[in-house]
Amino acid sequence: MCAVPVIIPAIDLKDGKCVRLKQGRMEDDTVFSDDPVAMAARWVKEGARRLHLVDLNGAFDGIPVHKQVVHDIAKAFPKLPIQLGGGVRNMQTIEQYITAGLTYIIIGTKAVEDPDFVAEACREFAGHIIVGIDAKDGMVATHGWANVTDTKATELAKRFADVGVSSIVYTDIARDGMMQGVNVEQTVNLAREGGLPVIASGGVTDMKDIELLKPYGDCIEGIITGRAIYEGTLDLGEAQLYLDGK
C-alpha cells in the first residue's frame, strides 16, 4: 500500500482532442486542447509523476481509437508511468499498449462482463493491470457509463483481490466533471472492503478534497484530477507538495 498518494492529471481523448466530460456524457464536453501531447508536457512540467489517459471514443466504441496519440505521449515521456483506459477489450490491445511504453492498462467494462479476462491479463502482464470501476450510487456502470448494472462496486472489487490486479481506479460518475467534491466515504470504503489500493477519481475540485483524502494514504494510491487543474481551482504542484508533507 502507498503511504503518499500521487496527483494524477487526466487527459481524456475525444476526436483527437483533450476534453473533459460532465458525468460521462459525450455530448457534454469541454475542449481544453487540440494537442494532447502538449497538454501532457504541461502537466509533466508542473510536476506530474504519473498520467491518466482515457480513450473516450474507445470506451464507447469498444475498440481503441486514439492509439497514435497515446503512442506519441508514451514516446515523449518514456520514464513516466502512464495508465490508460477506454476500449481495452482483448489481450492484443493490452500487449500493443505495453509494447508502446505504457505502464498500466485499465480494464473497465470487460472486467464486469468477463472477470476471467482480468485474471488472464494479470498472468500475462503481471504488475501492469488496473481494474477501472465506475459507479453511480455505488452500482457499477459499463460501456462508457452508458449502462448501470445491478452489481455493487465493493462486490466487484472483491473479485479481483487475489488475481494480481495492481490497483483499482474508482470513479464516482455522479461527481465526475461536476466540481462537487470527491466522494471520500465510498472511495475509502471500496479500498477497505476490496483489499486493493485505490486511485480516487471523480469530483476532485480543490485543496479541500486533497486534504480529505491525505489521511487515507494507506489505501489510496493516487488521486486523478481533470477539470480542477484545467480550470485552475487546483494547483497540481501545490497539491503534490502537500501530500508529500512539504
From Swiss-Prot:
Coiled coil start-end: none
Example of a GO cellular component annotation carried by this entry: cytoplasm
**Pathway annotation:** Amino-acid biosynthesis; L-histidine biosynthesis; L-histidine from 5-phospho-alpha-D-ribose 1-diphosphate: step 4/9
The compartments listed are: Cytoplasm
Q: Which UniProt keywords apply?
A: Amino-acid biosynthesis, Cytoplasm, Histidine biosynthesis, Isomerase
InterPro entries documented for this protein = Aldolase_TIM, His_biosynth, HisA_bact_arch, Isoase_HisA-like, Isoase_HisA-like_bact, RibuloseP-bd_barrel
Q: Its catalytic activity?
A: 1-(5-phospho-beta-D-ribosyl)-5-[(5-phospho-beta-D-ribosylamino)methylideneamino]imidazole-4-carboxamide = 5-[(5-phospho-1-deoxy-D-ribulos-1-ylimino)methylamino]-1-(5-phospho-beta-D-ribosyl)imidazole-4-carboxamide
Per the record's keyword annotation, is Aminoacyl-tRNA synthetase included, yes or no? no
**GO terms of biological process kind:** L-histidine biosynthetic process; L-tryptophan biosynthetic process
What Enzyme Commission number(s) appear in the record? 5.3.1.16
Note one Pfam family from the annotation: His_biosynth
Q: Which GO terms describe its molecular function?
A: 1-(5-phosphoribosyl)-5-[(5-phosphoribosylamino)methylideneamino]imidazole-4-carboxamide isomerase activity
Q: Catalytic residues per the record? A: 12 (proton acceptor), 134 (proton donor)
**UniProt xrefs under HAMAP family:** HisA (MF_01014)
Family designation: Belongs to the HisA/HisF family.
The entry's protein name is 1-(5-phosphoribosyl)-5-[(5-phosphoribosylamino)methylideneamino] imidazole-4-carboxamide isomerase
Q: Which organism does this sequence originate in?
A: Psychrobacter cryohalolentis (strain ATCC BAA-1226 / DSM 17306 / VKM B-2378 / K5)
